[in-house]
Amino acid sequence: MAGKKIAGVLGATGSVGQRFILLLANHPHFELKVLGASSRSAGKKYVDAVNWKQTDLLPESATDIIVSECKSEFFKECDIVFSGLDADYAGAIEKEFMEAGIAIVSNAKNYRREQDVPLIVPVVNPEHLDIVAQKLDTAKAQGKPRPGFIICISNCSTAGLVAPLKPLIEKFGPIDALTTTTLQAISGAGFSPGVPGIDILDNIIPYIGGEEDKMEWETKKILAPLAEDKTHVKLLTPEEIKVSAQCNRVAVSDGHTECISLRFKNRPAPSVEQVKTCLKEYVCDAYKLGCHSAPKQTIHVLEQPDRPQPRLDRNRDSGYGVSVGRIREDPLLDFKMVVLSHNTIIGAAGSGVLIAEILLARNLI
Amino acid sequence: MAGKKIAGVLGATGSVGQRFILLLANHPHFELKVLGASSRSAGKKYVDAVNWKQTDLLPESATDIIVSECKSEFFKECDIVFSGLDADYAGAIEKEFMEAGIAIVSNAKNYRREQDVPLIVPVVNPEHLDIVAQKLDTAKAQGKPRPGFIICISNCSTAGLVAPLKPLIEKFGPIDALTTTTLQAISGAGFSPGVPGIDILDNIIPYIGGEEDKMEWETKKILAPLAEDKTHVKLLTPEEIKVSAQCNRVAVSDGHTECISLRFKNRPAPSVEQVKTCLKEYVCDAYKLGCHSAPKQTIHVLEQPDRPQPRLDRNRDSGYGVSVGRIREDPLLDFKMVVLSHNTIIGAAGSGVLIAEILLARNLI
Amino acid sequence: MAGKKIAGVLGATGSVGQRFILLLANHPHFELKVLGASSRSAGKKYVDAVNWKQTDLLPESATDIIVSECKSEFFKECDIVFSGLDADYAGAIEKEFMEAGIAIVSNAKNYRREQDVPLIVPVVNPEHLDIVAQKLDTAKAQGKPRPGFIICISNCSTAGLVAPLKPLIEKFGPIDALTTTTLQAISGAGFSPGVPGIDILDNIIPYIGGEEDKMEWETKKILAPLAEDKTHVKLLTPEEIKVSAQCNRVAVSDGHTECISLRFKNRPAPSVEQVKTCLKEYVCDAYKLGCHSAPKQTIHVLEQPDRPQPRLDRNRDSGYGVSVGRIREDPLLDFKMVVLSHNTIIGAAGSGVLIAEILLARNLI
Amino acid sequence: MAGKKIAGVLGATGSVGQRFILLLANHPHFELKVLGASSRSAGKKYVDAVNWKQTDLLPESATDIIVSECKSEFFKECDIVFSGLDADYAGAIEKEFMEAGIAIVSNAKNYRREQDVPLIVPVVNPEHLDIVAQKLDTAKAQGKPRPGFIICISNCSTAGLVAPLKPLIEKFGPIDALTTTTLQAISGAGFSPGVPGIDILDNIIPYIGGEEDKMEWETKKILAPLAEDKTHVKLLTPEEIKVSAQCNRVAVSDGHTECISLRFKNRPAPSVEQVKTCLKEYVCDAYKLGCHSAPKQTIHVLEQPDRPQPRLDRNRDSGYGVSVGRIREDPLLDFKMVVLSHNTIIGAAGSGVLIAEILLARNLI
């Protein structure tokens, strides 16, 4: 596979790791070579180490890879490493990899709030990757060896929340009030053990530890402008935008649904039709860059009264497309709408792969 | 059963009708004698006419009742008639019953918006029954025969929404901004055929026809004051309160969960602890009147981070208690909280029975 | 699309019809041109007529086809017509089509028991299509116009049941005792309205009308030999094989699981390993014929203790592969095993398409 | 509470322990005083130690009990101890309790196969308690202190399987062939963590570790006669009865459904009606003894074509009643039928409490 970048996956036996492996199988630009997991799995063939729970079969390309421990020494040949590590382990491991000069795209929450770490939803704020470009250029200019770096994938439900906001803000100006109530899929809680069956059969759980804080905080970083020197992002202040999230777990395997309400700062607010048109016409930069996984239609605006629904819409554009429906006026704010995003693809591993494709397109790896 | 009032049920084979029958079985004050359903069922024993779908067994008291057609002539002996009729049939039938002098407590939406028809959540606005008292007194004063009347049970999710608001408004003054996103049980859609299995397995439906409009409108009637002459309710105006609802169907059999946010008009807003204390201390008038089904604890304030949950909390006080949890500050409005109510008991048939108990306590039947 | 056969679908808006349309979209040998449905849908664009419930999006190739009534006059150009009609309508309509000289592959039960109508599971008994070949040859020899014919797709769970039996019987001789207990997906009950949500949430239904009789009868036709004159099938007698089925509906969208036990007539019975090897080595005739949809691995033998499972295995070979696991000795009969088949693909519409591919390969259309 | 026996529960925070606590709350004959759990919970109030997952609220009687470690020294005052311990811990702990002279009714599998330990389904083989009576009498006759003893509750699905067989065997003689395919509720797998949500949403699992062996073995002990000297049970031999089980997990919270087939040794076999009548007329000894929890109707024979169903029938007689439906002839054996039993009541904790009531009625505690 001449010309392909070598990829590694950390946390390869976990739910996000499994999804990375699926997405990297037969990828035109990346060749999956190194899989890292716990010492319990290290030394085994991947097929023997993993409890595969994806509905797609385990790709042959990963079956016989011998699992390594999560140490940078085993990942030296990698141009890019995708981390699906649990937060308990990600902090130390990813730091060690970065200090070893490795480029990491991480789904863990550990470094999301670091000023100089881009927190990216690839269909929303790819320009924040300038932080990495600026870091590489600086090192180069200083004759230093090429530094490693960490790029963080956003929280899964935040990805769905901000996706439609980007084009709306670009067109109609700032949003100063935003609420979301989520109905989140259980795959978001992973498999070890994940959401217990007894808790989600004939039930919902009105609580996901830390999720609301993540959504309320991360939205203010993702939608924020870069500092002039491109070394960091200038967080939006509470005065600029108030975000309120309420998160629930429901009996859905994949696909987070969010009931959002928003208010534009500028008066008068646009019409429902203007909002719909704006969303339909939005083409993300990743698509313009020709990235393999970038959805042609970033936001699918649905007209049926009862859509989007996870079962029927989560796989649009292979899970990279975000669906928005029931766009209507809100008696309290300006608009109410229902947003659906595939929580393990555009909400996690998929974003990671698309971020890597953007890095490749910008020669940052 | 000396001293018991005679009760009838309309729409006896439907989901709400079945719940009325369960609640009226062995009731200390009501004796179920007459069951009305479609012509298809009329003439049959109830046990042979109904496709019983309740998890409690069909009460023996109803088993052998011969089903009648829904005509007032068959219900003459009834002191009170509970209507679980579908809206398509309720309008004409309930009108005919009222004009025949019969007292009806109806779960149908048909007359909810009529000025002189009380729309009651028995743990919230029993005082609106003064409209009926005033009507009966007027007829008596004019020497006219005792008139029939219709009292409407609110929409199921509205009942859960307004239950905690009543004590808060009494204590801290008006609420001027209110949002709710619901996760509603499928029993709310009835059984003929109700929500199709294929639509709710590994899925949610972000739409319930007419529900948002009902919640936004009915809240403004239930929380409104009576007119001085007690002939009607003075609806709250949009200036007084803005209500925004987003309704979803989830894979739960019974129990509507609602993620609500609210803002008090008066500044400063109370503290979280003050809100909790207010809710805990609230005792509904129905309990003070000694009504059989009135919950001792109207609002159960739960402290666990992940409660209330339908599976674990819907049956508090046999479904008459409303649970509130996760009471916390809202970055946009004042407070966010999760409310759970049993949609076919305090949200429908249960409210009907409790309304009848209040009527009995006030000698209005 | 030169060289492609023209296809039509009857019952196009139903669940089986929708699946035919998905499978025929971009098919290398068939071009979908005519869609038939009820008079309510006739005259509308398909996209406006259907309530699309498949997890894959509605193919563009079907979107704008104007729906016809189910009359042969509108299907004259069709080389093959796939019928997903409900049994209530299939009888008369399919007869009219056959008498108009049209070739029909039908999923309806109406003609399955007719002596001269082949009942086909394409990976099991394609040789029964000789009945059609013989009928066409006879007409040709008699100088008559080319007759229409009906080929029936088997009952969905019977397809899964007989798939592993074919290779076992070929290798180890007759099976004289066969039991199956099914755990069947709700998509098998269609969408109008299909299994009610309230019946399948936190529940199973130990009954599927007519299913056990279908399984016990159809098995004896599918596994039977052709009569010498190839005009019909000589049903297996109860002395030759006793079949006992118990059918249940479970909360699974697609994929029927069956717990089967079987006994070979010949003694001694083979070993577990011999059974596994036999199943692994089996290659169906359709694959040998080069049919587009034929699975390379007809029977997937799984070694994990808890497999097959619908969620993880139903899509093997795009739903044409049948999975068998937990092959073990049975204290009462010879062997017990778990069989999983995709009930709307190899169990219904998929089989129909594969049958048509076999007809094409044998120049019977 | 004068006259009540003192009860203790081991494994009090687990799923079976929680069910024991619910059943013992307000029990007329037992007063719950001592709760044992892991060292992690010991010393805490029960309400603070447990993650309560029952749909009924935590009984006040257990709320403030300080949890003890599972050592007999803390249970000295107990007349009876109910063990919901996990098998990993039950072996050593229950042995220590027995050797300390304590009477234990255990839901763990550890001692079920010991010759001198009765394995009891209280509505089926209470006579096997003679082993305990005989042991107590012997000790008494030898002037030894009163010995402790262990009585085992059967495997949950075995309880449902054997319940209808007892009356049939009594009336029509031995059963020599018995098959069962189970559709088992997830509560049977406990809560730590129990069946993962991702494995049971839109899925079934055709495997429950060790379950089939338990059902096939335990049936032969429960249905067997006592040895003449009443010191043990003479297991039924494979020549006397062949039992074949296939076990599956389905998306049901409580209530195991079993599709069973059986053949009587004696010819001719009875008729379907004779089987129904026999089951209807059966009254278990526990009811004759006046035991509090004994179901008046041990076997509920249901006539609807699609019953029993877990959601509608599991709570018959508060979960102590077993429902049997679809009794019909089997083309291979004699009869097929569907059996439903509440897996945590008559299948576990409920049986334990009923066993204790029988012991009490027989003055064995």
UniProtKB/Swiss-Prot annotation, chains A, B, C, D:
Gene3D superfamilies: Dihydrodipicolinate Reductase, domain 2, NAD(P)-binding Rossmann-like Domain
Catalytic site positions: 156, 256
Localisation: Cytoplasm, Cytosol; Nucleus
Any GO molecular function: protein dimerization activity
InterPro entries xref list: ASADH-related (IPR051823), Asp-semialdehyde_DH_CS (IPR000319), Asp_semi-ald_DH_pep-lack (IPR005676), Asp_semialdehyde_DH (IPR012080), NAD(P)-bd_dom_sf (IPR036291), Semialdehyde_DH_NAD-bd (IPR000534), Semialdhyde_DH_dimer_dom (IPR012280)
Known pathway: Amino-acid biosynthesis; L-methionine biosynthesis via de novo pathway; L-homoserine from L-aspartate: step 2/3; Amino-acid biosynthesis; L-threonine biosynthesis; L-threonine from L-aspartate: step 2/5
Binding residue positions for NADP(+): 13-16, 38, 41, 85-86, 188, 343
Chief localization: cytoplasm
Inducing or repressing factors: By high concentrations of Met (general AA biosynthesis control).
PROSITE patterns per UniProt: ASD
SMART domains (UniProt xref): Semialdhyde_dh
GO cellular component: cytoplasm; cytosol; nucleus; plasma membrane
Entry superkingdom: Eukaryota
Cystine crosslinks: none
Positions of modified residues (Phosphoserine): 318, 323
Keyword list, A-Z: Amino-acid biosynthesis, Cytoplasm, Methionine biosynthesis, NADP, Nucleus, Oxidoreductase, Phosphoprotein, Threonine biosynthesis
Subunit-structure text: Homotetramer.
Other facts: Present with 18400 molecules/cell in log phase SD medium.
Family: Belongs to the aspartate-semialdehyde dehydrogenase family.
Protein name, entry field: Aspartate-semialdehyde dehydrogenase
Species per Swiss-Prot/TrEMBL record: Saccharomyces cerevisiae (strain ATCC 204508 / S288c) (Baker's yeast)
